[in-house]
Structures are given as C-alpha cells and as structure tokens.
Amino acid sequence: MNFRYNHTPFGYKRRQTREVKVGDVKIGGNNPIVIQSMINSDTTDTKGTVKQILELERTGCEIVRFTVPSQVDADNLPSIRQELKKAGSKIPLVADIHFTPSVAMKAVEYVEKVRINPGNFADKKKFAVRDYTDSEYDEELERISAIFSPLVLRCKELGVSMRIGTNHGSLSDRIMNRYGDTPQGMVESALEFIRIAESLNYYDIVVSMKASNPQVMVQAYRMLASRFNELKMDYPLHLGVTEAGDGKDGRIKSAIGIGSLLEDGLGDTIRVSLTEDPVLEIPVARLLAEKFNKRIVKPEPVRGYSEFRNPFTYERFYSSEIKVGTFEAGENHPVRVETVLPFENSNSFLANIAKLYQYGKSFSIEPESILIDSPSPDQLKEISEAAAALSIPVGILLGKNVSLNEKLQNELRGFPKVVFDPFLQFQDGKKMLSFLQERQNAGLYTEIHTSGAKIESFKGLPETLSEIGIKNVLFSIESKEILYDYRKLGSILSQHEFPILLHGSFSNPEEALYDSAIGIGGLLIDGIGDLIRIKTPKMKDIEEIFQLSYDLLQGTRLRLTKTEYISCPSCGRTLFNLQETTARIKSRTGHLKGVKIAVMGCIVNGPGEMADADFGYVGAGPGKVHLYRGKEIVMKNVPSEVADEKLVELIKKHGLWQDVINV
C-alpha cells in the first residue's frame, strides 16, 4: 500500500495545488491559507443575514457561507446581494446545499461558490443495507450524474466555483454498503462527484473531508491527498473539524485536526466550527493560518528517516511497560499524564500536589506522575523525603549545568525516574551506559531527553542499548518542531520497544493549548506517545496546564475523563438557539465521565453527524426535538421545554447516569 500523502512527514512543505477563484479570493496555488466561516441566521431574514456577513467581514473573514435549504431561501438571495452591495461589501458568498439540487440551480445565480455534500445531494439517507453488483453500482453513478451534471454545467457557465464537501456522518447508503463508515468511504464519495465534474471539463473545485473526530478527519484528508497523487489531481483542500463544540474543547479539537494537517503541508482554506458566535471562529482560524502563512520552508531536504506509520489508520506504537509501584505506562496502558512542578520546599511542594488532587476531583482526573524541574543537588534529600509521602512517582529533571558525578548518581537512586541530556551530562558514552545499567539493576527508570537539533545523534543508540540489555529507558525531545522531530524519533525507535514521552515546553497557556494540540495531539492520533508532559514557566498556570493535558487526551479520543460533546456550530437550518441549548445540556450532564452526547441543530447534521455519540438531541421542527440512543430515534417530536429532562431520563434508563459529587 502506498503511504505517501505529502512531500515528507519529517519537515514542512506545502502541497502544490491548482488555484481556484471564489470571487476575488484565490484558494490554493501559492496564495495564503484563506479563512472562512458560516453564519447561523435564517437565510430568509435579510437584515439578520447581512448583519452577520458584515460582522464576519470586519473581523477578517475572507469567505462567508450560508445555508440555502429551500426555494424560499434561494428566492431571498437577490435581496441579500442588494443589501450587501449597498453596504460596499465584496466578500464572496457560498451557498450550502443539502438534499435539494433544484435549489442549488437557483442559488448558483447569486453566489461565488456552491458547496454540495456528495452524501445527500442526490441520495436520501435511509440506512438501508444491501449489496450492489458492479452493474447496479454503475447505474447509481449514472443516476447521480444526471442529477449533478446540470449544476456543474451552470457553475462552469457562470464562473462559479464548487466545494465537494464530504461529511463522515452523512455518507450515502450506497457508499456505506460498499466502503463502510470509513475514511476510504469519504474519499470515494468525493471522487465520484469529481469524476463527473471532470467529464464535463469543470475543474474549479475545492474538496473537504470533515468529521467530528479529529482522528477520522486527519486520516480521510491524508487518504484523499494520497489518492490525488495517484490520480494526478491537484484540487485545493478545505480543512475543518465539524461539530467541534465550544470553549477550549472546541479549539483543541480544531487545532488537532486542522493544525496537524497544515503541518503536513495539506490545506488551502480553513473553517473552525465552534458552537459560538461565528465571529469568534475567526481569531482561532487566523492564529492557525498565520503559523503557516508566515512559515519559512527550509531549503535542505530531510533524509535518513523512513515512514514507520500507516497514516490512514490508528495503530498504537508498541512499547514495553513502565512500572513504578502502582504507576503503569507504555505497552497497552492508557497514555499517562506527567505534571511538572517546581520545588522550593517540602511544604509548598506537598501543598501544590494537594491542590492538584483537589482540583482534579471536580473533573475526575488526578496527578499520575510528577517531575521536579531542575532542582539544585542540595535539595534532593528534602525532595526524596517529601516524595515518600506520595503514592505517585516523583522524578527529577536535571538542569543543563548539572554534572552527573558519582556523588550525584548515588543521590539519584532515591528517585524512580531521572531525566537527563546525554550530550550535556556525560562526555563519556561508556559512563552513560554504566549509569543506565546501574539504574536498571536497581529497578529504576531513566528518560533520555535532548533537543531536536541533536536528534541525529540518537541514531544507533537504541541498538546499543538493546545489545547490552538496557530496557528501562524512555526517550523525549525538547523542540519547537514537535510533530516533525518526534516523527524522526519514532523512525529511529521503530524497530525497538522503548517508550516515548511527548514533551512540550511553552511560554504561556494559550501557546500551550494551540501548539500542544497541533504537535502532541497530532502525534497521539497516530499512536505515538506513552506519556505526555506540558510545561509553562509560571506556577499559576499549573492547574490550567494539568487540565489541558487531559483535555488533549479527550480531544484525541484516547482517554475520556469527562462528558464528550458533539455539537454543530449552528446555521440557518438550526431550529433552536444552539448555544443556549448546548450550555444548558452541559450544565445538566457535564459530570458524566466518558458519555458522548450530540447536540445538533437540525436533521441534516442529525443522525449522521452525531458520529459515535451515545445520545443525541436533534432539532426536528419549531419547538420540537428528536432524542436518539446511538443512531436510533427513541423519542420523536419532544416539546423543547421538556426535552432536557427527557434526555436525562433516557441516560438514566440506559444506566449511564451518575449523580453529581459535591467536592
């Protein structure tokens, strides 16, 4: 199988694509990454729609999308256009179409771009199970071509571009029956429509592969890029994690999916989907885009590293077990969290530990491993005595100027883990190996930690350690290029079983949130990493960083320590105030560890886009809600004023309710 989907996994180079014009905005080619969003007003409300479009334009949005669900909405587009012209707005508009080809034919007259969903443009979702023969499948493609071709020809005639936007949760029954609910199904769904467009010599196409799970979303885009390479297609990519939610969780999920793909050189335009006011999406999108619009591509090629992953599926990078008392990591254990703390004295240190435990009680999380950051050697005795009062391991990170002499090595035997840089602490390789062997003989662990600039020097070390039987070793890196350098480390360690600790050092919590989501999150969804450790310089940030570590694991779906929400960003199809409803449901259910709840504004993003949610709350009509258990409707047309309570009753009925524990 061909795993090639970008220039290289070990360095940055943007994928070359054709340029597609959306009005005066150019997507792809050598143009900067374009920022876009979607309004949530009713498209028949001219005043409200124009107001939101202008607000987004002022905030820095470059393209605006709105839903056109019916002929009535399409009929109002001339009024919207007229009012925008009066206001001096030139921002390109995108009509979002589901289910209604006839509406698309009207909308195309008044917009610069049309978005169609190949899963429902010519198909109705019936969840039917059947086997298609090849001839029956071909007949279906001919039927789709007959429905889709008129829109393609009209777009071509008017100079209107198109996004073929696949959503993981709304694949057609035909695709589902042949490929399953998979990234491959998403890719093939889009390719079917692209081929129809190409048969009509239409190429002004942008493509997207959206999912609410960043792992699925990333795999689908990579697979699409790989197929594009095979088919000699060069269409620009529109990136987005759909139904990402709100607050920090929504930003983390978006950064994991969008950011890690941009690091891979994939992506020409982005939309951050938050269940918030659309204008709040723009600063997040700008932050992500600017990282790469300003990126300097290093001229030297990356050599000496080979692909060790299957980038199209999740597979945990196998490592041997780490066991210190009751602490277990590596092997098949969940990815663990290590927290960095300073040490001034025993009292303040133990108080900080107690503070973390107290904080964690409210969120069903707790400290798992502690690392003391660069203590002075004369503090080690006091640290050891304080650590003896704890049930979790306490390790030591040696400062850069500390020499690992014999006296210090003896003092470090009181700590289950020591982190050191072999290129700073040892001048003699034999002495380093002797140090590692002595610690292993005592049942202790050592973390070999160095800068990304020195990673080449790691080559050959795993083989040496394996030859002399040293196993109690972890590897980590200090780098601003977290994704690339840890992939290099993974390549070096790919034939060995040494655990990997994902380390990120950041200047403040905001930088930590976005850069750790892109770097550490991007590695986690590839199965790389047995522990994570996030570090900022200020003690006041510790609780926030502690929470962020677990939020990253939640966002990658590797450890669910709180309720997981899948909520759409709202649009003109939404049948209730989505932000208020989501906040209300969170207030009732936010303590349900590991339960997945979808809050969806309408039937378009309902059964499908709920993905793997345990329960769903989906708008069914004005003042009416459908409640789901999985993908099955269990309560229809529930009045919205009692729907929250009925949802709680449904959760209780299925045994997933827990009473709130007051801390």
Curated annotation (Swiss-Prot):
Residues passing through the membrane, by range: none
UniProt KW Cell division keyword: no
Keywords on record: 4Fe-4S, Iron, Iron-sulfur, Isoprene biosynthesis, Metal-binding, Oxidoreductase
Cofactor(s) required for function per UniProt: [4Fe-4S] cluster
Pathway linked to the protein: Isoprenoid biosynthesis; isopentenyl diphosphate biosynthesis via DXP pathway; isopentenyl diphosphate from 1-deoxy-D-xylulose 5-phosphate: step 5/6
Pfam families cross-referenced by the UniProt entry: GcpE
GO terms of molecular function: 4 iron, 4 sulfur cluster binding; 4-hydroxy-3-methylbut-2-en-1-yl diphosphate synthase activity (ferredoxin); 4-hydroxy-3-methylbut-2-enyl-diphosphate synthase activity (flavodoxin); iron ion binding
NCBIfam families, per database record: ispG_gcpE (TIGR00612)
Designated name of the protein: 4-hydroxy-3-methylbut-2-en-1-yl diphosphate synthase (flavodoxin)
UniProt organism field: Leptospira borgpetersenii serovar Hardjo-bovis (strain L550)
Lineage per the UniProt record: Bacteria, Pseudomonadati, Spirochaetota, Spirochaetia, Leptospirales
Gene: ispG
